[in-house]
Amino acid sequence: MKILIVSDEESPYLWDYYTPGRLAGIDMILSAGDLKASYLSFLVTMANRPLLYVPGNHDAAYAAAPPEGCDCVDGKLVTVNGLRILGFGGSPMYSGGPHQYTERQMEARIRKLGWKIRRAGGRLRGPSKRTSAQDEAFCAA
């Protein structure tokens, strides 16, 4: 499966200088946030493939005008073409803006989906034994 992953900056190669066939062979597009809704709508239209996204810390506008033709997977466990995808958008808390989370808030978001993760054959792991606060975030396996 070929997956195009995009985030943070629109690619002129795909956006400004698009030519038919440029996205040929792509099976799915994943957006990790901080892109214009119009860019994502363009990609899903031109590729004619599923586009899944999570909002980034600069995507507050998605609430009023989400990308057309795209699926938000923030806080969801989905299966596309046999591939399980768990989406968590946002960033570490730095200014209190939308889609910013403390470690405890992100841990709570993950634990909320614990039953879906386990039902899909995954498991939740607790904090690592490392001392770095960044390394102690809970993760889904």
Identify the residue ranges that each predicted region occupies:
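A generic structural signal for short beta-strands and their flanking turns/coil linkers
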Residues: A47-R49, E68
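Short glycine/serine/threonine-biased micro-segments
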Residues: S31, V54, G87
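Short glycine- and Lys/Arg-enriched binding-loop motifs that mark or flank ligand-binding interfaces
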Residues: I29, L52, L83
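N-terminal active-site segment of His-dependent metallophosphoesterases
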Residues: M1-M46, I117, S128
